[in-house]
């Protein structure tokens, strides 16, 4: 488990309660939030819609849309993604941009049966697709002049709360050998060996920071990569050109990795130049889900549809690592006896933590309608329900009591942090001969119970155009999404002494779908 303090012996992980459980509640949400994805055509319409068919995005959206196919096709959608992140931390503004090209943002093949003119079931189609359901790529940097606290203050509060003695902190440290190097088993043990915290007496608590007075310039960096990709198998049929039904099964593969550093640069400190807190996480996982969908054509000008998607049942394996690095004024620091000493270490890694757990993502349901403007195009809209409050996480990696506490703790945190939402998408397509023009907009509601004066809803804007021939089609699309989030480097007993970074993201996707009929 990811805990910032896990002292061996008689000290249990202080943060294996609230903070650790909230971390895994956040993980469940991260792997459950679906971005705009699919073909350029559907992304240009504002996202995947419940009441429109004849597009390969129906394979993982509403599989009933496969019933509209009257010929087979194969298509691929390369995507270029650019993410601009702006941070605001203690009044300092920073901007970071990052771009990435993916050859196969979406790839699909649809195989359609011959029409049955004499039967009620006119035709059916089988589809297979590969799609990037989520991209975890993000990079940001924040800076700020902090006169109130440092990460060091959090370590002091944690170790004093634990009541750990110096001998217990020593037991949580392995000096290693000349080839292996030092290794700590808790954050306080690392800070103790670096003389960043000192005991008040032989028995330890209360510990004090080696410098608790100097202001500092804080610099934080975050770099994340990875994606949630899905292979989907789907089947859809057409009953009498009125009722379209379909079902699909999706297999997910999740890869997520981040590296985070918080550097405290001390200003005019008699002891410290800077202290770095390093953190890294690598996650891999697999999951499975299923979707059932229906579309009903009321008349040539109007049709409505809906789909139900089960939670994705997934399992994850993670490795969490941390390290502490310090740089001292003139290479020396004041020790517990009040004299200047030269520390034996300036960099201490912590033992990596492996953990395995399972997540049940939200149930999803979509309902929509489409109005056709004769042969000139259509307008379509979709309302989507997402049950974020129903997410679950559990594990069998710990002992029975630990497994139970993990399950109950994450359920409690999910209910306290997240709420069910209703998302809305609207799009339209205009046709002139073989040419198509498209536009769309989507609103993804804020899933957090506590808004914290930050609106975390997302707005999605999209435009696109395409051409359709007898044997070939091509669609070009572009999307813009905006969102806000909050990152708090550390918390203290007094909320007035620490700050949070507000992160504003703008994500631009440009995609090209090319395909052929056969």
Per-region residue spans from a language model:
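Bacterial N-terminal signal peptides that target proteins for export
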Residues: 1-8
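Outer-membrane beta-barrel translocator/receptor signature
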Residues: 40, 52-61, 67-147, 229
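Outer-membrane beta-barrel porins/channels
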Residues: 23-37, 42, 112-518
């Amino acid at each position: 488990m990811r805990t910032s303090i896990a002292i061996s012996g008689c000290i249990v992980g202080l943060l294996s309660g609230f903070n650790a459980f909230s971390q895994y509640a956040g993980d469940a949400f991260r792997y459950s939030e679906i971005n705009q994805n699919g073909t350029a055509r559907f992304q240009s319409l504002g996202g995947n819609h419940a009441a429109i068919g004849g597009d390969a995005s129906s394979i993982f959206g509403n599989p009933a849309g496969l019933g509209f196919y009257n010929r087979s096709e194969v298509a691929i959608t390369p995507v270029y993604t650019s993410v601009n992140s702006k941070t605001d931390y203690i009044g300092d503004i920073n901007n970071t941009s990052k771009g990435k090209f993916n050859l196969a943002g979406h790839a699909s093949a649809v195989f359609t049966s011959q029409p049955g003119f004499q039967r009620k079931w006119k035709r059916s189609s089988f589809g297979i697709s590969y799609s990037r359901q989520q991209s975890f790529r993000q990079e940001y940097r924040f800076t700020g002049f902090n006169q109130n606290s440092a990460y060091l203050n959090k370590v002091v509060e944690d170790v004093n709360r634990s009541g750990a003695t110096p001998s217990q902190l020593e037991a949580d440290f392995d000096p290693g050998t000349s080839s292996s190097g030092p290794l700590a088993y808790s954050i306080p043990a690392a800070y103790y060996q670096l003389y960043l915290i000192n005991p008040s007496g032989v028995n330890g608590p209360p510990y004090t920071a080696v410098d608790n007075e100097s202001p500092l310039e804080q610099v934080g960096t975050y770099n994340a990569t990875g994606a949630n990709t899905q292979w989907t198998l789907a089947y859809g049929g057409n009953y009498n050109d009125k009722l379209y039904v379909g079902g699909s099964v999706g297999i997910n593969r999740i890869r997520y990795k981040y590296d985070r550093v918080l550097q405290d640069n001390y200003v005019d400190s008699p002891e410290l130049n800077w202290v770095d807190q390093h953190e890294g996480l690598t996650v891999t996982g697999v999951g499975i889900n299923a979707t059932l969908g229906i579309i009903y054509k009321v008349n040539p000008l109007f049709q409505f549809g809906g789909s139900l998607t089960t939670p994705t049942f997934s399992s994850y394996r993670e490795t969490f690592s941390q390290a502490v690095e310090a740089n001292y004024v003139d290479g020396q620091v004041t020790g517990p006896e009040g004299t200047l000493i030269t520390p034996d270490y300036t960099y201490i890694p912590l033992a990596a933590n492996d953990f395995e757990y399972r997540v049940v993502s939200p149930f999803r349901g979509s309902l929509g309608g489409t109005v056709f403007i004769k042969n000139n195009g259509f307008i379509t809209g979709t309302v989507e329900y997402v049950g974020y409050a129903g997410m679950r996480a559990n594990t069998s990696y710990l002992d029975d009591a630990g497994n139970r506490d993990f399950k109950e703790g994450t359920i409690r945190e999910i209910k306290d942090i997240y709420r069910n939402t209703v998302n809305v998408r609207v799009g339209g397509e205009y046709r002139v001969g073989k040419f198509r023009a498209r536009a769309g907009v989507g609103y993804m509601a804020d899933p957090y119970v506590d808004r914290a004066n930050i609106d975390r809803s997302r707005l999605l804007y999209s435009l696109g155009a395409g051409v359709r021939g007898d044997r070939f089609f091509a669609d070009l699309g572009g999307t813009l999404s905006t969102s806000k989030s909050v990152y708090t480097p550390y918390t203290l007993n007094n909320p007035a002494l620490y700050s949070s970074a507000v992160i504003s993201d703008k994500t631009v996707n440009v995609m090209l779908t090319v395909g052929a009929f056969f």
